[in-house]
């Protein structure tokens, strides 16, 4: 049991997150925790699912509250198997099935009715209801992701103040008021990572406009630039145009459309190769699509990578062809490293890229994606000019920290 007295009168802050896998929100959380002066703030971290390889990058001044932890990637097959075991344990061994049976059934029927069944959205409530409890009262508890971490923070954390982050387009995410069960009413502040994310969140929860603030993602820019110069990156000696995408292989990220765009580029005679850094549940599906399209040498799935930054530094074009977005850490990383960027014209992306100035925004069709890439390959001076503008973008908004300090 933790001592309830704050060490040296430091303010205590608990961060709660769903997993610590290698994804954008987790990277932003690590950068945010590094913003706090350890002589004034006592930081804690609780990982709801207790899994993810980025746990090893948690700053040394942060106390991890999980008693047991699995550092296998949440995207690897072994990691996904462990996640299933965790969910089954919550359902069967910790009484989650009995406790949340009505919630599961009613929301499952709602999903079926809406033709959008998402098992993970159902299970976050079960994981929150069966997670560890702590006696300590924190000065501030912060749920850093939607779903489980927000449910847990709202219902089970003993804190003087509570806040939650929203990183996604809430109108397209699959979360609903019924799933959320009133969790946002229990938070003192709601932080969205962009203006557009705030706008879309308030379409679902208009009554929380007064307590919703924009709090931009933080990045460790010095670390990104340092790691970009390390050994690694492309190893195939390809002499054509390299295209890079970094992100989980999920429906949201749109790799199925990207493969179709690559097929069009090949048919047009554009000498290019598209690389993907990342893993995910749809990897086998995308692999089959690649083979069916005859693109085995043209669209390459490299898998997850501990250090993606040499790839950013070495690529010719960074493409972010997502169906929807909150605020993309991958785009920000590409901007830090001065990449030529092309992205889909969707929520999130259009707030990060000024079309024709520091990147290209394209309509979300295979043909338009191919057009944007071809335009950049045929106009190197324009591409270089946009890459320079991208590298000069302001990334970190230090003044946003005041939104947290005012709660302490």
Where in this protein do the model-derived segments appear?
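Aromatic "clamp/platform" in nucleotide-sugar-dependent glycosyltransferases that forms part
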Residues: 304, 323
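Short hydrophobic beta-strand element within catalytic cores of glycosyltransferases
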Residues: 340-343
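A conserved mid-protein helix/loop that constitutes part of the nucleotide-sugar donor-binding site
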Residues: 26-31, 241-264, 270, 281-287
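Conserved acidic donor-binding segment of nucleotide-sugar-dependent glycosyltransferases
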Residues: 355-356, 360-367, 375-380
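A short, well-ordered alpha-helix in the C-terminal region of glycosyltransferases
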Residues: 266, 291, 368, 375, ...
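Short acidic/histidine- and often glycine-rich active-site loop of Leloir-type glycosyltransferases
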Residues: 333, 345-356, 360-361
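Donor nucleotide-sugar binding/catalytic pocket of nucleotide-sugar-dependent glycosyltransferases
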Residues: 161-167, 171, 185-227
């Amino acid at each position: 049991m933790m001592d309830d007295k704050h060490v040296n009168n430091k303010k205590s802050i608990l961060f709660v997150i769903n997993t610590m896998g290698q994804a954008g929100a987790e990277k932003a959380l690590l950068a945010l925790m590094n913003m706090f002066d350890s002589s004034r703030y006592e930081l804690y971290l609780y990982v709801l699912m207790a899994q993810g390889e980025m746990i090893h990058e948690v700053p040394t001044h942060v106390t991890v509250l999980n008693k047991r932890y699995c550092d296998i990637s949440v995207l690897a097959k072994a990691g996904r198997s462990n996640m299933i075991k965790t969910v089954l344990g919550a359902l069967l061994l910790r009484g989650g099935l009995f406790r949340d049976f009505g919630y599961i059934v009613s929301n499952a029927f709602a999903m079926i009715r809406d033709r959008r069944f998402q098992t993970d959205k159902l299970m976050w409530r079960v994981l929150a209801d069966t997670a560890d409890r702590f006696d300590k009262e924190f000065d501030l508890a912060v749920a850093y992701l939607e779903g489980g971490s927000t449910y847990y923070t709202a219902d089970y954390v003993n804190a003087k103040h509570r806040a939650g982050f929203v990183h996604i387009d809430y109108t397209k995410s699959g979360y609903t008021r019924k799933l959320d069960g009133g969790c946002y009413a229990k938070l003192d502040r709601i932080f969205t990572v962009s203006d557009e994310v705030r706008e879309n969140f308030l379409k679902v929860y208009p009554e929380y406009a007064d307590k919703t603030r924009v709090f931009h993602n933080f990045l460790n820019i010095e670390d990104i630039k340092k790691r970009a110069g390390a050994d690694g990156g492309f190893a195939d000696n390809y002499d054509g145009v390299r295209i890079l995408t970094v992100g989980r292989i999920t429906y949201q990220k749109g790799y199925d459309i990207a493969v179709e765009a690559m097929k069009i580029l090949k048919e047009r005679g554009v000498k290019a190769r598209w690389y993907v850094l990342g893993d995910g549940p749809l990897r086998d599906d995308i692999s089959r699509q690649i083979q069916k399209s005859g693109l085995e040498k043209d669209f390459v799935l490299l898998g997850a990578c501990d250090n993606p930054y040499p790839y950013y530094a070495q690529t010719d074009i960074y493409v972010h062809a997502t169906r929807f977005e909150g605020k993309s850490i991958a785009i920000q990383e590409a901007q830090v490293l001065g990449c030529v960027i092309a992205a889909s014209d969707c929520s999130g992306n259009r707030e990060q890229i000024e079309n024709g100035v520091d990147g290209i925004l394209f309509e979300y069709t295979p043909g338009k994606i191919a057009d944007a890439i071809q335009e950049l390959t045929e106009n190197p001076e324009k591409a270089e000019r946009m890459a320079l503008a991208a590298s000069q973008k302001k990334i970190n908004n230090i003044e946003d920290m005041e939104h947290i300090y005012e709660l302490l």
